[in-house]
């Protein structure tokens, strides 16, 4: 199985810092970050540190949703760990690796709103820009492509998640 580079480690780092600057200048700042596990954890770690460098220090609460299991075809979304009562009245920044059809992000936003968040914004490392997506991201590091992506937290049946770049399997 060969891999093709889409975005290098250096390109990702520069883009994450630029995205943090954009978020830090927004009129409504988040006060809590909520990464979607497992795919969003690496991007989330980089983004919250970049935000701290911009003077935006966020509390962190994890949300663990699963939609792919061990295959490439999305299945029903299951919640492993949901939002806590600590997000009630808070401005939440949901962070995920990829926005494909948007089902996972849509579920996350619904759960967070139901838990009483004052506002919910979404940041993703890669937005595939699908016209049929059921969710939208407020902040996007990279756009486009319909490839099945790997690396930087995103996997193929549990493999390739720890790669320091975003690539695709060819």
For every predicted segment, state its role.
Residues 1-170:
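PRPP-associated nucleotide enzymes
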